[in-house]
Amino acid sequence: MPSLGRLHLITDTRPGRDPLTVVRAALAAARADLVVQVRVQDSATDREAYDLAARVLALCAPYGATCLVNDRLHVALAVDAAGGHVGADDLPVAAARHVLGPTGVLGVTAREPRGAVEAVVAGATYLGVGPCHATSTKAGLPDPIGAVGVRDVVDAVDVPVIAIGGVTADRVPALRAAGAYGVAVVGAVSSAADPGRATTDLLRALA
């Protein structure tokens, strides 16, 4: 299994966004410290997801950065990504582990300790925990759990916890103090005037 970077960048494929340009800038700043999670809109076709994932994987390769595919594990397998990430509405964790095999990286979204423990028992490599703060990137999310909620999950499991949801460089120290191994971001990098600089700021906060 590849080493897990502390900064996870989730691709922003909303209309008007340019995910590949953002990924290029972030990789130039973070290199192998970056994990890129390819996430597409629900309306995207599998072919569109495949094309984006293949291009992101090609960008990651020279840096030794890890590429994962969110939700669509068949796409992860098709492009030979390092693994994938599943949420509550995706495949059950045990089924996702079966699809990826014993060595694939499997991230699982969790919100509270009980679900987190169940996910780890079923085969999760790491947990994406949140939302930590309010975010406009993804609609329909539950109320934020804050750093306290992150700590509750960290105390319950023995795998890396990646805090997600409204994460900014200013909020990273509190999340790290709560035990988070790293953070996952969308808007903090993709909406920044300088995605490379934003990536550097996040990495410094994580150090």
What positions do the PLM features span?
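Conserved N-terminal beta1-alpha1 strand-loop-helix module at the mouth
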Residues: M1-H85, D90, H98-T125, P142, ...
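Short beta-strands and strand-loop turn motifs
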Residues: V35-R39, G128-S136, V183-V186
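Glycine-rich beta-strand-to-loop/alpha-helix junction loops that act as flexible
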Residues: V129, I162-V167, V185-V189
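Short, glycine/charged-rich beta-strand-loop motifs at protein surfaces that mediate ligand recognition
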Residues: T137-L141
